[in-house]
Amino acid sequence: MTELQVGGVTPLTTIDFPGELAAVVFCQGCPWQCRYCQNTHLLPRSLRSQIAWPEVLDLLQRRRGLLDAVVFSGGEPTLQRGLPDAISETRTMGFKIGLHTAGCYPERLDELLPAVDWVGLDFKAMPEDYLALTGARGSGERALESLDYLVESGVPHEIRVTVHDALLPPDRLQRLIDLLADHGAGEVMLQRCRTQHVLDPDLGDNARPWEHAARCSAAQWSNGPQQADGS
């Protein structure tokens, strides 16, 4: 029996898988402690699943014909060993598969990519700046390795960069965009960092992120993906 810790489900979204009507399954647990994380209730690995995976399957069964896709988000979905089986069961029901990931586990991502139709990869900073943001040593290198696996796979994808004035000033952001281009990344979307209810209460206001748009090339602004509501 597939074991997947689920922290919440969004039954319908139009923005988490471009061009598709999708449900989002928020997987519990994340190995990183990103300062601007707003889904802090999804960080602990030890919490019991808020929704049993069979209940999620029942929900998806009832929504066949109404939805095009299911997106596995988090937390960090690749943390969970049950994710491949959950993806297989969902695909068997006729849904396309989307995946939101920060690239924490490159090898696991590489193994999953043949079963995935679209990936939203959160790329947070220049690799050498990751430790100050995630609190995890080697996280930048793992994210870059995941990007390379993703590009090599040919799976359609979007790179999402969260912009905060203090964490990613214009010069660092432009360097990051150039790095992503050098590695063959697809569309790069910038999303404004929202500082309410984040993991680090001392992060401070994000006053003028739109100024970055005028200074940085090859990227667009987006409203960002859904947050988990626990429903």
Which residues make up each language-model segment?
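Gly/Ser/Thr-rich helix-start
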Residues: E20, C30, G75-E76, A136
